[in-house]
């Protein structure tokens, strides 16, 4: 079960603020960094863009500083299972989800529930965090699929281009082009444009 220790949605600290926990925080820390940050990971300085995510494991050193403005949403929690292993996304590594607004919305809902006195609060928080992690995992998996599809299409279009250049005398109608790459007209226009 995931147990939430603390969370904050849309948290602003002072400009250039630094977080430095050399021994980690003793729990998992999930960050949605809404502004660029300087992060030190395994003795390497990385400057993030906005909407970077990071899942720190419990004993991993946490050292990050705002490039200027400091804004993030975050969760401190413990879990019986490693969320990264369970849901297949990176830990102690920066990644950029394509759905940062959705993640932020989850964190907002989690914080609202955290401060409520409603029945089954802890169970509901567990479900919300699990749902957020599933959403992140699906996003990263589908992005990998889309990248692979894009690479395959690129090769198909490169081969088609070579075929057209090698056979300039032939008539190359849109129907034939679609047939060569096995796409419908509408799909062809989307990818070719």
Question: Residues of each region from the PLM?
Answer:
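Aromatic/histidine-rich interaction motifs
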Residues: 86-108
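N-terminal regulatory/effector-sensing and dimerization cores
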Residues: 2-93, 122
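Short, flexible active-site loop motifs that bind/organize anionic cofactors or intermediates
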Residues: 41, 93, 115, 167, ...
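An amphipathic alpha-helical interaction segment
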Residues: 73-80, 100-148, 152-166, 189
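Short acidic/polar alpha-helix capping motifs at helix-coil junctions
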Residues: 1-4, 23-28, 106, 125, ...
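Basic/polar phosphate-binding segments, predominantly the helix-turn-helix DNA-binding elements
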Residues: 170-193
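A short, mixed-charge helix-start or loop-turn motif at secondary-structure junctions
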Residues: 17-19, 89-93, 114-118, 146, ...
């Amino acid at each position: 079960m995931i147990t939430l220790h603390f969370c904050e949605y849309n948290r602003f600290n002072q400009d250039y603020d630094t977080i430095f926990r050399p021994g980690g925080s003793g729990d998992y820390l999930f960050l949605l960094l809404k502004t660029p940050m300087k992060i030190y990971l395994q003795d390497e300085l990385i400057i993030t863009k906005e909407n970077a995510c990071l899942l720190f494991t419990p004993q991993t050193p946490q050292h990050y500083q705002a490039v200027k403005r400091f804004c993030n949403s975050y969760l401190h929690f413990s879990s019986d299972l490693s969320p990264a292993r369970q849901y297949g996304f990176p830990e102690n590594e920066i990644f950029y989800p394509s759905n940062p607004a959705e993640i932020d919305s989850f964190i907002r809902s989690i914080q609202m529930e955290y401060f409520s006195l409603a029945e089954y609060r802890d169970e509901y928080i567990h479900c919300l965090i699990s749902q957020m992690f599933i959403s992140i995992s699906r996003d990263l998996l589908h992005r990998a699929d889309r990248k692979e599809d894009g690479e395959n299409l690129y090769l198909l279009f490169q081969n088609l281009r070579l075929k057209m250049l090698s056979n300039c005398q032939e008539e190359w109608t849109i129907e034939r082009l679609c047939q060569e790459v096995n796409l419908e007209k509408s799909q062809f226009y989307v990818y070719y444009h």
